[in-house]
């Protein structure tokens, strides 16, 4: 239940327009930084902000850790993601876990599923897909993230481990 409460709070933060370094340009006091760092939302096809697909990502060096969320067929799907930045705008998602869906078949309580999928920033937006020709498909826009939510995510034990390099087999 705690996990779903955090997802709901993150969704509400996107609606409230509270501080984010993407929207405000303020790096704040966060121990993380990088172009991927922040909250990203894709709201195409929905009239309810709570149903927007989203990533909340924290970046330390080339390590990107965060959460993902999407709403489909009347159900909430959420989980965690680890990525490795190859450049300032290109990364590869290497590990994922969460509610069983098209994103993962591994619950977070059971560990991490290894994957190799893109995560890119193009035209100021985040993309987790590539077109057939390899070009970027940017549809997640940067949204404001409340600093207290950033701090809460940083305080999660799994996030502390992730930003410190655990699991260690992630590049």
Features from the language model and the residues they span:
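A glycine-anchored, Pro-Gly-centered beta-turn/N-cap motif
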Residues: 34-39
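Sec-dependent bacterial lipoprotein signal peptides
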Residues: 1-13
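Intrinsically disordered, low-complexity regions
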Residues: 6-9, 61, 156
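N-terminal, post-signal-peptide region of Sec/Tat-exported proteins
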Residues: 59-76
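Phosphoinositide-binding peripheral membrane targeting modules
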Residues: 78-80
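Bacterial signal peptide processing site
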Residues: 16-19
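Beta-sheet ligand-binding and adhesion/scaffold domains
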Residues: 22-28, 42-47, 51-56, 84-171
């Amino acid at each position: 239940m705690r996990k779903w409460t955090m997802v709901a709070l993150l969704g509400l933060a996107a609606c409230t327009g509270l501080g984010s370094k993407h929207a405000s340009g303020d790096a704040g006091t966060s121990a993380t930084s990088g172009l991927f760092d922040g909250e990203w939302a894709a709201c195409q096809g929905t009239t309810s902000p709570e149903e927007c697909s989203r990533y909340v990502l924290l970046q330390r060096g080339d390590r990107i850790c965060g959460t993902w969320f999407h709403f489909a067929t009347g159900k909430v799907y959420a989980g965690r993601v680890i990525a490795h930045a190859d450049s300032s705008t290109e990364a590869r998602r290497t590990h994922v876990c969460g509610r069983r869906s098209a994103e993962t078949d591994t619950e977070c309580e059971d560990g991490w599923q290894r994957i190799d999928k893109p995560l890119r920033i193009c035209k100021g937006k985040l993309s987790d897909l590539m077109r057939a020709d390899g070009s970027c498909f940017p549809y997640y826009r940067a949204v404001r993230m409340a600093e207290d939510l950033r701090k809460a995510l940083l305080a999660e034990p799994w996030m502390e481990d992730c930003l410190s390099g655990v699991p260690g087999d992630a590049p």
